[in-house]
């Protein structure tokens, strides 16, 4: 079945535009996070930007060409503090997985496009995880827990791999002299 002239075609292009814009916003947010001393958060923004690029690419490949007129609202916000940017990103991801993609999937099903409905639903799963990660990182900033924890944990220097055990990441890595900004909780998930 052709997408031309369907609501699903408009929804795909709307989602493509939204994912593309999110990618750029997250790249800008990464730069701010890095400047504020949050290297791990900057890397998460960059990783998520690349994931949004993949979503946009999947959607773009579904389109059949030609011009499609869309009317949509997109965030035209500013680049705030890293905590502000995490909140804005989490709110956007929440909208995508709780409202936008489910409604787009419902329309696709009504139009007999089950395969596209499933794609919308799969992307929504990723957006839910993006929101969860952003909200957790925002909470860490607001509670002063990015580089300090209540219990002893293993901290890993993202630059050289040095591991320190303690409630707080070192102010300076004793192995490579990189600042605290480069430390994260050691995650062994292999």
Predicted segments with their positions:
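Non-heme di-metal
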Residues: 1-190
């Amino acid at each position: 079945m052709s997408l031309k002239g369907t609501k699903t075609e408009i929804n795909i292009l709307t989602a493509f535009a939204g994912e593309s814009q999110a990618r750029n916003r997250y790249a800008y947010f990464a730069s701010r996070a890095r400047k504020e001393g949050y290297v791990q958060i900057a890397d998460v923004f960059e990783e998520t930007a690349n994931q949004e690029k993949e979503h946009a690419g999947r959607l773009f490949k579904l389109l059949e060409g030609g011009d499609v007129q869309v009317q949509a609202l997109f965030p035209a916000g500013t680049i705030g503090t890293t905590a502000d940017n995490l909140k804005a990103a989490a709110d956007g991801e929440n909208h995508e997985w709780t409202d936008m993609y489910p409604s787009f999937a419902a329309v696709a099903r009504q139009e007999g496009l089950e395969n596209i409905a499933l794609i919308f639903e799969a992307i929504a799963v990723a957006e839910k995880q993006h929101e969860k990660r952003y909200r957790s990182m925002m909470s860490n900033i607001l509670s002063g827990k990015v580089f300090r924890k209540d219990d002893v944990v293993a901290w890993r220097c993202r630059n050289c791999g040095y591991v320190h055990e303690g409630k707080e990441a070192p102010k300076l890595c004793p192995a490579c002299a990189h600042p605290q900004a480069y430390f994260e909780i050691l995650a062994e998930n292999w």
